[in-house]
């Protein structure tokens, strides 16, 4: 049965072909995404082509929404650029620094090792806003579990004591309560590290809303074949970076000058921008949902990739584009009827009338989408997302064990 509730994960892959290679990504279904990276099904990333086969090493779940997961993913990928992490990874001695003649610190830019990636993850889980999200870190490899413990032992020497939750699960009821809510009267809030087998994780993972199972996805073993023929329709498709839906012909979209490959719907960037803070306020129940009205026009927006800020008026004037019918489609040799002047005028009036109806329809769709997202945010707060059923928890409690990462204070 399809579920309308999406779970958001950041995953960490390890390559069998290249022992030092790793990859960080985001998905609502990491197991299906792993198959895509390995070329079993369509739409794998180009960067993972040379490292096939890949294995799932770490998976971080429990994010409140897609935006939070994407921001976590970007910070994990670019810790030397992210404002939240760049100073802290220095204090954790994860990376060395240099000083120029102008006394500016420059982080060494090189490929991050697997141990550094794990250290960065542990560092991020102690920082705002992630330390308050009650995230769960699923660890699938013994070597990664050992690496995590080594990092914990290492940071003791520099007098850093992160607060990792390592509960003592007494029985199934405590396990249910802890994984459902992340807290109860016995345990404090914190990041949970769970040692889990990949097959167990795959078995208990619910299918995402867009497919019942992996069997619904067309098999394409040659997905990484460079000679693969791309269809004419797909070659001109533009997808919104935030909602991952196609931008229709005639629709306006925003293209950021800092990241030209990032294109988003205007309605999506409106929710990402000024109203994002208001959504967090609604979720935190600082005031009821019925009293909340998000601004239809944001004052400021930020690039979803690098988080560079832009004023809405500036973006509206300079960066909004319209997706038009590609000129190549007019060169396919299609025969078009020759119209007289009177027929052209009637056709033009008819087309303008249709465009007006389409624009009104898009406006109503944007308003409905906005209202539905707000209702979903409120509904998610009122009713916690249940990852597994009682029967599934009974089995997972026997197959998984929590990793003890308790740091004794000196």
Swiss-Prot record:
It is found in: Nucleus. It is an enzyme of class 3 (hydrolase). CDD domains: GIY-YIG_SLX1. Keywords: DNA damage, DNA recombination, DNA repair, Endonuclease, Hydrolase, Nuclease, Nucleus. Residues 6-89 form the GIY-YIG domain. Its cofactor is a divalent metal cation. InterPro entries: GIY-YIG_endonuc (IPR000305), GIY-YIG_endonuc_sf (IPR035901), Slx1 (IPR027520), SLX1_endonuclease (IPR050381). Catalytic subunit of a heterodimeric structure-specific endonuclease that resolves DNA secondary structures generated during DNA repair and recombination. Has endonuclease activity towards branched DNA substrates, introducing single-strand cuts in duplex DNA close to junctions with ss-DNA. Belongs to the SLX1 family. PANTHER family: STRUCTURE-SPECIFIC ENDONUCLEASE SUBUNIT SLX1 (PTHR20208:SF13). Forms a heterodimer with a member of the SLX4 family. This is Structure-specific endonuclease subunit SLX1 homolog.
């Amino acid at each position: 049965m399809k579920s309308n509730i999406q779970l958001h994960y950041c995953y960490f892959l390890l390559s069998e072909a290249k022992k030092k290679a790793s990859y960080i990504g985001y998905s609502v279904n990491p197991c299906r995404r792993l198959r895509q990276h390995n070329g079993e099904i369509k739409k794998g990333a180009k960067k993972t082509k040379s490292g096939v086969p890949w294995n799932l090493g770490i998976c971080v779940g429990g994010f409140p929404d897609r935006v939070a997961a994407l921001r976590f993913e970007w910070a994990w990928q670019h810790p030397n650029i992210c404002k939240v992490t760049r100073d802290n990874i220095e204090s954790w001695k994860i990376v060395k620094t240099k000083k120029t003649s102008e006394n500016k610190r420059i982080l060494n830019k090189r490929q991050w090792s697997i141990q550094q990636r794990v250290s960065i993850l542990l560092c991020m889980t102690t920082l705002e806003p992630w330390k308050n999200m009650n995230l769960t870190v699923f660890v699938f490899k013994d070597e990664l579990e050992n690496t995590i413990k080594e990092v914990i032992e290492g940071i003791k020497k520099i007098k850093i004591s992160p607060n990792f939750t390592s509960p003592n699960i007494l029985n199934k009821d405590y396990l249910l309560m802890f994984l459902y809510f992340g807290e109860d009267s016995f345990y404090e809030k914190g990041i949970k590290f769970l040692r889990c087998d990949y097959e167990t994780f795959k078995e208990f993972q619910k299918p995402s809303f867009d497919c019942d199972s992996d069997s619904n996805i067309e098999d394409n073993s040659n997905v990484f074949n460079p000679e693969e023929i791309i269809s004419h329709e797909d070659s001109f498709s533009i997808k919104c970076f935030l909602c991952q839906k196609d931008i229709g012909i005639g629709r306006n979209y925003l293209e950021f000058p800092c990241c030209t490959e990032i294109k988003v719907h205007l309605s999506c960037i409106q929710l990402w921008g000024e109203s994002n803070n208001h959504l967090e306020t609604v979720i935190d129940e600082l005031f009821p949902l019925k009293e909340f009205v998000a601004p239809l026009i944001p004052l400021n927006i930020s690039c979803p990739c690098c988080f560079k800020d832009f004023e809405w008026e500036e973006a509206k004037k300079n960066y909004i584009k319209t997706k038009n019918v590609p000129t190549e489609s007019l060169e396919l040799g299609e025969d078009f009827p020759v119209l007289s002047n009177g027929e052209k005028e009637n056709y033009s009036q008819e087309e303008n009338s249709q465009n007006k109806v389409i624009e009104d329809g898009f406006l109503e769709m944007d308003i409905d989408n906005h209202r539905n997202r707000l209702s979903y945010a409120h509904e998610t707060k009122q009713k916690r997302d249940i990852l597994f059923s009682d029967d599934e928890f009974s089995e997972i409690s026997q197959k998984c064990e929590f990793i003890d990462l308790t740091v004794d204070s000196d």
